[in-house]
């Protein structure tokens, strides 16, 4: 089972925003890789190479965005198309807006494990009953997503998919990072609880990486992946 992680940065400035002295996009790429996303694709404009430099040494593919006028739906589809070009066996993608900076890698793992036992629905994480992001989208629903209007924002796109009959599932993960974005400082987040029970029946060995791991602690093994621009939507 191969599940990609698609990180969506709205601008180079947002991608490079310093979070505890590290570029946001680097933090997210490492979290996605640690949580089991393969491949990890970052969709971000990079006019001067600064985003690529921030990702150097990470196991990640940097993809040129679709045209801005094509809307959020095209950016999501762009990332998934690139992931499928890299790994044709990709079955699903975790769509991760970069503003959701505090998501724990365990949440990604929980989404992937849940997809393994229940592969049909779109899976949305929840914290204390409130649905959030990132969202796991099976590629079987990619064309339904691609058909949606370019003026729809990410939450509205999910509503449109549900209205079109795409099945959804909400997964409680106990991660405040799924519902609190960069408008909330990390020290102001509610306590991390973790999932009430593992999706696959076994406990993960890590805890809240956002709360317990030093931000300058490197992850082993990542290298920058080559990439080629794919056609926009």
What kind of region is each of these model predictions?
Residues 14-19, 23, 46, 66-74, ...:
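Residues at secondary-structure transition points
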Residues 25, 142, 154-158:
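Structural element of the ATP-grasp superfamily
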